[in-house]
Amino acid sequence: MSLPTVLEKIIARKLEEVAERSARVPLAEVEALARSASAPRGFAEALRAQVESKEPAVIAEVKKASPSKGVLREHFVPAEIAKSYEEGGATCLSVLTDVDFFQGSDAYLQEARAACGLPVIRKDFLIDPYQVVEARALGADCVLLIVAALGDAQMLELAATAKEVGLDVLVEVHDGTELERALQLETPLIGINNRNLHTFEVSLETTLDLLPKVPRERLVVTESGILNRADVELMEVSGVYAFLVGEAFMRAEKPGAELRRLFFPN
């Protein structure tokens, strides 16, 4: 299947970005920063502990905007949002660092992580080992690898780099073919994105269809389209307890209160 146009544009921009950033701060410098960064908080471990107790493990997203929806939150203070999520019962945070398409920032990740005790994933479009090392230098505990954006060799190289610098990996898939490729990686975390990259339509059936093909020892995170209690219950009944949710929270006045309402109503 051909790459969706928006993903093509993003990848083209990332190639430029890596060239710009590595010219500004050479890899050796970023590696030194990564070595001196505060210890990883154990992203996969935190999710697993929550899932094993059959409690919702929520990766709550700090996200200002998206290419399809525009600005989601005008009053955007990452530290405030992170604290609100922690109080609301989030297990981990996801912070968008992509500038051009999601109005994210590296600083947002640093501010959010400093404001709470939760493990944080750098949500960006990683195509080069430089960005993985950079994620650790920023203080991230985990990185996202999007199978649709990567070749197999590239994906394996990025996962190996993550392991070297002490980062967990969440590998994201959209269909069965991508899932087969993702299972080459050792990471326990498999993210199933319910949004079709070509049409932007969201269907929770994506998670339910792919679930039987995921080995039991892996931990499935369902991403996109969790909007109400019925969605949460549908997943839990199917044995999925890990969720990545952004938009539903970002549009709420108090993101953490919305998280609690959606996942911990009692």
UniProtKB/Swiss-Prot annotation:
UniProt GO BP: L-tryptophan biosynthetic process
E.C. designation(s): 4.1.1.48
Biological or metabolic pathway of the protein: Amino-acid biosynthesis; L-tryptophan biosynthesis; L-tryptophan from chorismate: step 4/5
Record key words, sorted: Amino-acid biosynthesis, Aromatic amino acid biosynthesis, Decarboxylase, Lyase, Tryptophan biosynthesis
GO MF annotations, alphabetized: indole-3-glycerol-phosphate synthase activity; phosphoribosylanthranilate isomerase activity
Stored Pfam families: IGPS
Enzymatic reactions: 1-(2-carboxyphenylamino)-1-deoxy-D-ribulose 5-phosphate + H(+) = (1S,2R)-1-C-(indol-3-yl)glycerol 3-phosphate + CO2 + H2O
EC top class named in words: lyase
Family as reported in the entry's similarity comment: Belongs to the TrpC family.
PANTHER family: INDOLE-3-GLYCEROL-PHOSPHATE SYNTHASE, TRYPTOPHAN BIOSYNTHESIS PROTEIN
Name this polypeptide is given: Indole-3-glycerol phosphate synthase
Organism field: Azotobacter vinelandii (strain DJ / ATCC BAA-1303)
Source taxonomy: Bacteria, Pseudomonadati, Pseudomonadota, Gammaproteobacteria, Pseudomonadales
